[in-house]
Every structure is written in structure tokens, then in C-alpha cells.
Amino acid sequence: MKVQIYQLPIVFGDSSKNETQITQWFEKNMNAEVDVVVLPEMWNNGYDLEHLNEKADNNLGQSFSFIKHLAEKYKVDIVAGSVSNIRNNQIFNTAFSVNKSGQLINEYDKVHLVPMLREHEFLTAGEYVAEPFQLSDGTYVTQLICYDLRFPELLRYPARSGAKIAFYVAQWPMSRLQHWHSLLKARAIENNMFVIGTNSTGFDGNTEYAGHSIVINPNGDLVGELNESADILTVDLNLNEVEQQRENIPVFKSIKLDLYK
């Protein structure tokens, strides 16, 4: 499976400019060999929290329409990061994915809001865990958002249910880059799966984002990584490595869920 990871410099509070940028990246970099494209967290407006009432998408209307067009045009699955999204008069940080036929194949509201950013004052937390879902080729994957990375429990269910890739879409700060590397590697090792961390880069107010989008294999080895610059990472994944690792280290056969509280 060939995956392209878009490490974008999100334009703060301007969904139109961000859509234009994404469109240009597709036009310049897309080719028929790519199976999946991945975008970062909150790519429509960034963390312009105080103005999301006016700027957030409405029930994924514009964001889905935009991504659907790209998926159908380029015949590629898109793990479409996440966007600020108003639904039932509440604002969510909503991740979604669209297959190459233009179908919405996943939607997930960020469960864990970041207290350090006072997200709870502006956003509503999701009430459902991330689910496994199928890409066009039948591969089961799952999609989580940024701060979710610090909660290993959230990935356990989709991993045990057969997901072979975990996509963490993020706007992760430079000040915690060490945590980014360590936590992504841990999630890959403990679940015997590929983990792909897609981050943004540049500045959002006083916050510098770390970049360093990264792919880790089921053994915890580095497959590919960007630096802090805006760029695209393209990797080829051998998904047979997941089954091989799960046979070699059968953690899900050893797990004792009845003992855990």
C-alpha cells in the first residue's frame, strides 16, 4: 500500500486558503500509484478556537464536498484529517475519511479535549470511541486525533478488531516533540500495527507545530519521517508485517480483559 502524508502549514482561520493549498498539493504530487492520502488535524481553520462559531463547517458539508471531489478526481482514498464542525449547535473536532468512490467511510469526533488549550470551553467532546473501518482495498484501519495519542485504551479496541493501520492526525507542538516520537512508537509496538502520525507545521499564534510526520512499523521501527518543514512523505507499506508480528508476539491472545478495571 502506497501512502502519501501531507504535512501542511495550516493557514490560521482561513478555510478557503487551506482548501486552495491542499488542491495545489494534489495537483503537483498525485499519481496513479498512490492508494491513500492523509491530512492533518483541523486543516480547515486551524486552532482558531475563539472564532469557530462563525468559521467551523456545518455538519461536514463543505469539507466533505471538497474531499469527495478530490477522492473521485484522483481515484484515491483520503484519510481527511479532522475539521472544526458544527452539529446540533455544538462544535466538534471531527475526523473523517472518504474512499476513492467518494463515499464517507468514517466519522469520529475527538473524545479527549486538551485541557492545556482550554478546548472544553470551545469544543464538545465526542461520545463514541474510534471504530475500525475499511479502505477501498478492504484493509481495516482506524483514525484518531492528536491528544488521543496519550490514551492507549482508545486504540486497543480497533486493533483487537483487526485494524492494521492507526492514523493519528494532529497539530502537535514542537515543545512536546519527544512525546510525539515516543508515544507513536509505543502505540505501534503494543498493538503490533502500523502507526502513521500526520502533523502540521509552522506557527499558529504563539504555538510552533513540530512537523515530523512519521510512519512506524509493527515492530516499532522507523519507516519514514519528515523534518519540521512543509513537505510530503510517501511510503510503501507491507501489510503482511502486521499478521507476522501478531503471530510472533500474540499479545491479543494473551490479553486478560476480564482482569482489567
UniProtKB/Swiss-Prot annotation:
The protein's enzyme class: hydrolase
Domain CN hydrolase span(s) in chain numbering: 1-239
PROSITE patterns: CN_HYDROLASE, UPF0012
Protein EC: 3.5.-.-
GO molecular function, one term: hydrolase activity
CDD domains: nitrilase_5
Annotated PANTHER family: DEAMINATED GLUTATHIONE AMIDASE, NITRILASE-RELATED
Family per similarity comment: Belongs to the carbon-nitrogen hydrolase superfamily. NIT1/NIT2 family.
Protein known as: Hydrolase in agr operon
Organism: Staphylococcus aureus
